[in-house]
């Protein structure tokens, strides 16, 4: 058999180079942002694995970042389970992103332990499509419990955490979000593949669906279900 040129071998889909995004055949859900999907293994949010989204404070665009995926999954009948958010989500804003309010569950907790428990149970449930808990100081062993809970599931575990969160984490993907004028900067801290040196600037507001129709339709949707 004739030897193949080295470049031909290196360009084979089964070969991964350390300076490129990992080519992995893993389940994923598109983020809704082509620039971000292009640099994520699998082309979207990893399903069945933890993703951490870090920010210096709530309201830096972290929730808007996951709205396209949340809309896709709630429209298919899966639950969006919001665990211990720092503020009550504005229902018309969710609708403007295409989220079905009838598939949104708001879980109120009294402690970090309750938040972790609620997150773990949600990740074990195959009815939940997107589980974004707001977690503060969470030890690595607790994160590993969450990773174990989501294994074998195709849900998205998108953990919102403060920017000072410890670097040691079992999460397959870690992002940091910050504001820059009218755009949101997304910096990849960890992924399967090489690092991304420059942040990606995203226009989160450009993903809103037509405001008039969907927002008006919010009155006809069921209210967000709350669980205490």
Predicted regions mapped to residue ranges:
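A contiguous pocket-lining binding segment that forms or flanks enzyme active sites
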Residues: 123-168
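A short acidic, amphipathic alpha-helical/loop segment
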Residues: 65-69, 93, 118, 142-146, ...
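Phosphate-binding/switch region of NTP-binding enzymes
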Residues: 157, 161-218, 226
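Short glycine-/polar-rich loops that comprise or flank the Walker A/P-loop
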Residues: 77, 100-102, 127-128, 153-156, ...
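Hydrophobic/aromatic beta-strand patches that form the interior of the parallel beta-sheet core
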Residues: 51, 81, 105-107, 132, ...
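Detector for small/aliphatic-rich hydrophobic stretches
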Residues: 1-82, 96, 101, 191-194, ...
